[in-house]
Amino acid sequence: MTEDRFEDLGAERRAEIGDQLAERDRTHPEVRRPEVPRPGNKYAWAVGIVAIMGLSVLLFAETLPNKGKGLFGLKPGRVIPAFAAPNALGNAEGDPNICQRASRCNKTIGTVPACSIVAPEVVNSCQLRRKPLVLTFIFDRGADCYPQVDRTERVRPSVPGVTFATVFFTNKKRDQARAIVRDRGWRQPVALDDKGITDLYGVGVCPTTVFARAGGRVVTTRLGNLTEDQIRHLAHRIER
């Protein structure tokens, strides 16, 4: 038989004690011990950040003009390829000519070699590479690349022996592109590109800056923004 510890008490007394205990349970509930936290992965936050960064790179990559394996520009030692393209401030129309030699010319890349197209309203890389050259590539989407050209403009007067030029890959109307160049005060030649030059040079990062010695041989290709001091230092380097 189960022992009742209140069996010696009367019914009323047992009821009274029961009520008192119930009231005590209500006013003094048992303190619950906090749950022990489950062991977590201390690197989980890092995995999350990497995943977000990967998504950002993927989204940015979708805006790049050049998605092939040549994403980082020309390697040192290469001679910059020939192109002839409309100057943003001129009235020349048409797509850039990127034909490297007569035997390979066609309607897609140009019916004559690019080097043969020389005119005041045309930006011709064969003319540019006669002197040390700083050639900047910018896009009008994906990132704000325009300030890089602003910086090259401020550096340009301090290295008069170096030519500065820009390739502007844009889908804007001609008047819009011309307005950008004028409003920002760019005095260096700005070649308008429809993607052909950018792909030819293997550019997929905005901005990309190519530094080449006289004759067009590349010394270095730099990805991303550069300070004025960096631009000036590299410009002096290609003079030697």
Model-predicted segments: where are they?
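A short beta-strand-turn-helix
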Residues: 84-133
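Short, Lys/Arg-rich cytosolic juxtamembrane segment immediately N-terminal
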Residues: 31-44
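Hydrophobic membrane-insertion alpha-helices, especially the h-region
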Residues: 44-62
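Thiol/disulfide oxidoreductase modules built on the thioredoxin-like
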Residues: 130, 179-187, 192-239
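Structural microenvironment flanking redox-active thiols in thiol-disulfide oxidoreductases
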Residues: 131-184, 196-199
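N-terminal intrinsically disordered, acidic low-complexity segments at the extreme N-terminus
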Residues: 1-32
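Ser/Thr/Pro/Gly-rich low-complexity linker/stalk segments immediately outside membranes or between
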Residues: 34-36, 62-79
